[in-house]
Design a protein with these regions (language model features):
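Short amphipathic, basic-aromatic surface patches that mediate peripheral association
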Residues: 91-101
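Short beta-strand elements
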Residues: 45-61, 160-173
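Solvent-exposed serine/threonine-rich low-complexity stretches and specific carbohydrate-binding patches
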Residues: 9-23, 49-51, 122-133, 168
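Mature extracytoplasmic or organellar-lumen-exposed domains after removal of signal/transit peptides
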Residues: 107, 120-173
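Low-complexity, Pro/Ser/Thr- and charge-rich linker/hinge segments at domain boundaries
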Residues: 51-80
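Extracellular/luminal low-complexity segments enriched in Ser/Thr/Pro
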Residues: 19-27, 137-142
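Short, aromatic- and glycine-rich surface loops/edge beta-strands on solvent-exposed regions
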Residues: 5-7, 28-41, 48-51, 145-157
Length: 173
């Protein structure tokens, strides 16, 4: 009987129920997967090797997840959102705009930036992906047509890299 052996450069290899899982060690450096067999006589025969390009994940996009007619919806900014939808939202999430990849991101924090009646810019921070009570109170008091910004959104993906995401312009309807 032959034993199949698999090895990888620039990565970690794990056997799964469906086959093999490869997790690259370093982005931007090729990963090479090699397969060989070991025969009954103990001789190892190389079957082949295949290089793969390992790219950095693109930056995700921040959004406010809310409920619309009982279904989850995503607000990415620059258009009006109802005050009710805004107040019912729990916080900020992040995802890749490219639907081909299902990558999970954790929002580590963000700032809600608004202008008071005197035109002064005020920032209120959250140290998670959730709106704070103070941020929710500010949104509750916003009148129709007012704008505020969600900025300095920090998100971390499965690669462990923390990224600062572009701001969201929120228009209260």
């Amino acid at each position: 009987s032959q034993n199949i052996m698999v090895s990888v450069s620039n990565g970690r290899l794990t056997r799964t129920a469906k086959g093999w899982s490869v997790r690259p060690t370093k982005a931007g450096v090729d990963c090479k997967i090699s397969v060989s067999t070991k025969g009954d006589n103990g001789k190892v025969q190389n079957i082949g090797a295949k290089p793969f390009r390992v790219k950095l994940l693109p930056p995700p996009v921040a959004y406010i997840e809310y409920t619309s007619d009982g279904n989850p919806a995503k607000y990415k900014g620059s258009r009006p959102i109802s005050k009710g939808a805004l107040i019912s939202a729990k916080g900020i999430k992040a995802e890749l705009d490219d639907a081909d990849l299902d990558v999970r991101y954790q929002v580590l924090g963000f700032e809600l930036n608004f202008f008071d009646s005197m035109g002064n810019s005020i920032a209120k921070a959250s140290s998670s992906g959730k709106f704070t009570g103070e941020q929710q109170d500010i949104m509750r008091k916003m009148s129709k047509g007012k704008k505020f910004f969600i900025s300095r959104v920090r998100a971390k993906g499965p690669d462990g890299v923390e990224k600062i995401l572009p701001p969201i312009e929120v228009i209260v309807n």
